[in-house]
A protein has these predicted regions:
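Small-residue-rich transmembrane alpha-helices
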Residues: 39-42, 302, 338-410, 451, ...
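Interfacial "coupling" helices/loops that link adjacent transmembrane helices in transporter permeases
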Residues: 297-341, 720-762, 766, 813-816, ...
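Short juxtamembrane loops and helix-capping segments at transmembrane helix boundaries
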Residues: 43-59, 65-68, 191, 198-213, ...
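Short, strongly hydrophobic transmembrane alpha-helices
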Residues: 19-46, 50, 296-299, 341-345, ...
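"Rare, low-scoring activations can occur
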Residues: 88, 183-192, 208-280, 492-506, ...
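Structured, solvent-exposed hinge/loop segments at the ends of secondary-structure elements
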Residues: 5, 10, 36-167, 174-181, ...
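Alpha-helical transmembrane segments of integral membrane proteins
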Residues: 1-22, 271-276, 304-331, 335, ...
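N-terminal membrane-entry
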Residues: 276-293, 378-382, 697-714, 756, ...
């Protein structure tokens, strides 16, 4: 009868007798399992683990797919204020339905004034999500209707800004200098909303409290809100979408005359899918990369076990000769592999725990649900299961190789060292070839990403980020209720900033490059859009003169804005090159006219006075698109919408300073100027434009670093595999080498012979690796920029690198082979 503990004791004793082999195998596998477990922790926390809400599978987003735009195609489109109210009232597929939007506030009344991220939410949103507060309560429908000034804090805000005070309920705070009362604190796990694919850590929540303007007929075309609902039991997404479309048809029938051309189609997506939409490709690529590293580590382990089995051929032959069952030998081989793998798995779990804690700081800020990334029991279970499965399969090859041992031949050979057998050699060579192939796939991917990043750094941004410092301020509506008050503050601030030592140019804007963009609808005089009326969209920016000089945006035609472009002068606009080429191809845009709004809107015409270069509004790898600029001083006459304060947030502007002085010095000077004008006004997001551009490149940089790290690990493991097989081959062919030298072969010939064997393996592996790299092109394509997935330069360099490393891995065994003493080796024979 089989005694498993006897087998285990035997295996442990044999491993203790080979400490070098055991340590090498365990640590090599620990690296592979540790890396895989760490990445699985991220995938589990972000992709696999359910959202921290009640029955999250019933949660869906509801948004508009707007004809003629890409809204709602792959993400939840925005909705309008009137739609939120109508969908809540008229749809029947949802248990509950709520709306929300992000907001920024000046928080004061506790410590230093600060600009915070917040959210306006309908009270039903808390019901939809099914999360109760940790302390206190959430706001009610009555408070929402009565516009009660109450706030619910996030756990992080409660801890950081209120020191976790258990008596925080009832505390009065100021939001945009209006008094609010704290009525609740949400649990630590409550993180909502996450701006889809972007960093958005909400610090507090306030009632939506729609204003009259937000529910007026004019607001029917103001898309800025998001909606989330909980489906009724048994209701499918398709049924919910059909229900919402019936309501949308009624909404469109009630559109005002100037909005009759709009067509909306409500779309419903699972909330879980949307939360991780933009991170899914990245995490999938990470998981594939780490799986490749684990595969190489497993191949190396299998190779080491195979070498160990070959060296134990005489022992195995003796045991088989005295009647040991073949199944028992196979079982012990597999058990030995499993023991090594479990030991590697336990060490790998420790490495993964360290990697998860350390790696959180390296993860891109665009990754949602970072707080959910932990090494929990499910992840530990995954690691141990992975270790057992890895050990089982890695033990099969040496186990079956041992069973094929020729008992008579092995016993006749006695203790002599000779060839390990063609079959065994081919199996070891196959493992190394596969290692080289997958390493080359990763190395090629790394090279393509590095080349893409290099290409992106060479892109003409359309502006000069060097020596530019930016900052944001937001004027609260209570103190700055009119455009005249806003203009006065902006003018005084700009005058003082321009007087600072070292300032070469100073301007202001509602948006800066490399931070994203918004869109607005407009009409170009004499232009008929082939897509139909009200389909022309562009990114608007309201600016204060000297913005272009401060940002370094070149003027191509016409002129920049001046101080004379105020509310009493002709309405003017500056367009970018892409805008001019699209609407006036081959023409001079100067003197052309456009206006914001729709065809039937009564907004005034603006005259084009300048054309500037295309400034990259998103990351450098994003395509340029139409953009126009208008003076802040003319905002009320232009459209009355862009930089106007609302009941909830003031006029938010970026300061843009070009100076030869160090950024730290400029930051202190800017803060002092703002504090002098308004001691309570916080200045936020103070950074250089170089930092802003670097942040926009962060996702691509992260991809490149991660894949390059895995590629390096894979190549090193493959080199180790080449070294081990060549070293063993040399050790098993000592007599052959001695005979060759005894018959007249030069030592240089022996070196070439050994090195050539390594290069042959590398050549076959590279052929397979290049084929694998071509097959992986589909996965890589979306991560590349102006680089072909089959870039010959990258593939040639990666192949040469693998050959060079293979040659280096073969060098030491080759030198050892050449240093064999023929007389001593033959005497041993």
């Amino acid at each position: 009868m089989h005694k498993p503990f006897s087998d285990l004791r035997l295996v442990l004793r044999q491993l203790r007798q080979s400490p070098g082999f055991t340590a090498t195998a365990v640590l090599m596998l620990a690296f592979g399992i540790g890396a895989t477990t760490a990445i699985f922790s991220i995938v589990d926390g972000v992709l696999l683990r359910p959202l921290p809400f009640v029955q999250p599978n019933q949660l869906v987003t509801l948004g508009d797919q707007l004809a003629g735009t890409n809204w709602g195609e792959h993400d939840p489109g925005p909705v309008t204020g009137p739609e939120v109210v109508t969908y809540q009232r008229e749809t029947h597929a949802f248990q509950s339905l709520g709306g929300f939007t992000g907001a920024g506030y000046e928080l004061s009344g506790i410590g230093e004034p600060a600009q915070i991220s917040a959210a306006r939410m309908t009270p039903s949103m808390f019901t939809v999500l099914g999360v109760a507060p940790l302390l206190g309560r959430v706001f009610t429908a009555q408070e929402d209707q009565q516009k009660a000034q109450v706030a619910v804090l996030s756990y992080i805000t409660w801890k950081s800004r209120f020191n976790g005070d258990p008596h925080v309920l009832g505390t009065k705070i100021l939001l945009d200098r209006k008094p609010y009362v704290v009525i609740g604190v949400m649990p630590r796990s409550f993180e909502f909303p996450m701006e889809y694919g972007h960093l958005y850590r909400t610090e507090l929540w306030v009632p939506m409290s729609f204003s009259v303007q937000e529910l007026s007929p004019d607001a029917e075309t103001s898309w800025y809100l998001q909606m989330v609902g909980r489906l009724k039991p048994g209701v499918t997404r398709a049924q919910a979408e059909a229900d919402a479309n019936q309501v949308a048809a009624e909404i469109m029938r009630n559109y005002p005359p100037d909005a009759k051309n709009f067509r909306i189609h409500p779309v419903v997506y699972p909330l879980q899918q949307i939360e991780v939409l933009q991170t899914r490709p990245l995490l999938r690529m990470l998981f594939l990369a780490v799986a490749v590293v684990l595969l190489i580590a497993c191949a190396n382990l299998a190779g080491l076990l195979l070498v160990r089995a070959i060296r134990r051929q005489r022992e195995i032959a003796v045991r088989m000769a005295i009647g040991a069952p073949a199944l028992a030998l196979l079982r012990q081989m597999i058990l030995e592999s499993v023991v090594i793998s479990v030991a590697g798995g336990l060490i790998g779990i420790g490495l993964a725990a360290f990697a998860v804690e350390f790696g959180r700081n390296l993860l891109p800020e665009t990754l949602p649900r970072v707080a959910a990334i932990t090494l929990n029991w499910s992840v530990v279970g995954f690691a141990l299961l992975l270790a057992v499965v890895t050990g089982f399969f890695c033990g099969l090859a040496p186990g079956f190789a041992a069973l094929r041992t020729n008992v008579n031949a092995s016993l006749k050979e006695g203790g002599r060292s000779g060839s390990a057998g063609g079959g065994h050699a081919r199996l070891r060579s196959t493992l190394v070839v596969l290692e080289i192939a997958v390493a080359l796939v990763l190395l090629t991917a790394s090279g393509l990403l590095l080349r893409s990043f290099s290409k992106m750094s060479e892109v003409n941004l359309g502006f000069r980020p060097d020596h530019v410092t930016t900052a944001v301020y937001s004027l609260p509506q209570k103190q700055y209720a009119t455009q005249a008050q806003i203009d006065t503050f902006n003018r005084r601030l700009l005058e003082r900033l321009r007087q600072l030592p070292g300032v070469q140019a100073a301007g202001m804007t509602t948006t800066i490059p490399a931070t994203g963009d918004g869109i607005t609808i407009f009409v170009v005089e004499g232009f008929v859009d082939p897509r139909g009326p009200d389909r022309s969209t562009a990114s608007p920016s309201m600016v204060i003169p000297d913005y272009f000089q401060a940002m370094g945006i070149p003027l191509l035609r016409g002129r920049y804005f001046t101080e004379a472009d105020d509310a009493n002068s002709q309405l003017v606009v500056i367009v970018n090159h892409e805008f001019a080429q699209h609407y006036w191809p081959g023409q001079d845009p100067i003197g052309k006219r456009m206006r914001t709004g729709m065809v039937k809107s009564a907004t005034p015409w603006m005259t084009v006075v300048g054309e500037v270069a295309d400034a990259k509004l998103n990351s450098p790898d994003a395509d340029a698109h139409e953009q126009f600029y208008a003076p802040v001083a003319q905002v009320e006459k232009d459209a009355g919408a862009y930089a106007q304060p609302t009941d909830l947030n003031g006029n938010s502007l970026y300061i843009v300073l070009r100076s030869a002085l160090p950024p730290e010095q400029m930051e202190n000077a800017m803060r002092a100027v703002v504090r002098n004008l308004d001691p309570q006004l916080p200045l936020t997001q103070v950074q250089t434009m170089d930092e802003v551009v670097a942040q926009s490149e962060a996702p691509r940089r992260f991809n490149t670093i991660i894949i390059s790290s895995f590629a390096l690990a894979a190549v090193l493991l493959a080199v180790l595999g080449i070294y081990s097989i060549i070293a063993f081959s040399v050790a098993s062919r000592v007599q052959e080498m001695a005979i060759r030298m005894a018959l007249g072969s030069q030592r240089s010939h022996i070196v070439r012979l050994v090195a050539l064997s390594g290069l042959k393996l590398a050549a076959v592996g590279c052929v397979l690796g290049l084929a694998g790299a071509a097959a992986a092109a589909r996965i890589l394509r979306s991560f590349l920029f102006e680089v072909s997935p089959f870039d010959p330069v990258v593939m040639i360099l990666a192949t040469l690198a693998v050959f060079a490393l293979a040659l280096a891995a073969s060098a030491l065994p080759a030198r050892r082979a050449a240093s064999v003493d023929p007389l001593q080796a033959l005497r041993g024979e």
